Amino acid sequence: MQTLAQTNNEKELIPKSFLQSGNDLPITNEIAFKHPLVQDIFDIDKEHLGLYSEDIYYQMINVFLTDPYTYMVFLDDKGIDYESTTPFEVFCLLFVEYMEKLINISKPLEDDSFGILIKNNIYFRAFSFFFGVDSFYIKQEQDGKKTLCYDDGKFLLNDDVYNYVMEFVKRINGIPEGERINPEDEWAKQILIEDERERLKKHALKHKDDETNTNRLGNLLSTITWTCNGGVTPFNRNQLHIYDLVDGIERTSKLLNYKNTMIGVYSGCIDKKKINLNELHWAK
């Protein structure tokens, strides 16, 4: 299947200029991955006047964040080595398991309620929001590889294109690459997995009753509105693409750091010889 996704074997690099264009990410001639406006995110939960829009949005982008390293415990429980699988394979495993659980708990429901529950599951909502397709399914190709399809077999995603999408999701939402440990051997790897298992258990107990909204989007909007040069206001900020919001805050932070450092240099508190002004510059 010919796609428009251009990938790099080492890393799915997407030019910063493209991110700033606000364009959707092209997948095929018929399908693109949405680069949402802030208003698009607000509109996710129109039923409740946007009250839960932010929570739902971050649940939806989490659907596409399936780094095997992050899911090492989940994979280990299935007898899968996280170093030998791909993000797309993890996505497929999570989707299948999620749908099986959803179907099982939905069995006592009437047909109408069952249909609504299936239609509104987080995977289908995410693909409807970002791709504009109501549902999708996993197709096993003759070579054993999996493909995501929609409608009557139209191509949506495969292993390579999924990496492209995952990179786009992380870039436009300002999600950094997490730190990781590279174990020397299988013994060290198993220790790492068990340590992660314990961390997840403690995290689950600690946050069991914690339903506090982190308000990340709200904090980003507040920051860009009141610390930028005045171009972003309460009256136009909803028309920013999500990457503009993230990039604007990062650029403002660099500018403030540059100004504060230069004040330190001019006042004699910082030795100019010990800093790299080119790397420090806010326009880099």
PLM region descriptions:
Residues 97-210, 214:
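Hydrophobic, aromatic-lined core segments that form the binding pocket/scaffold
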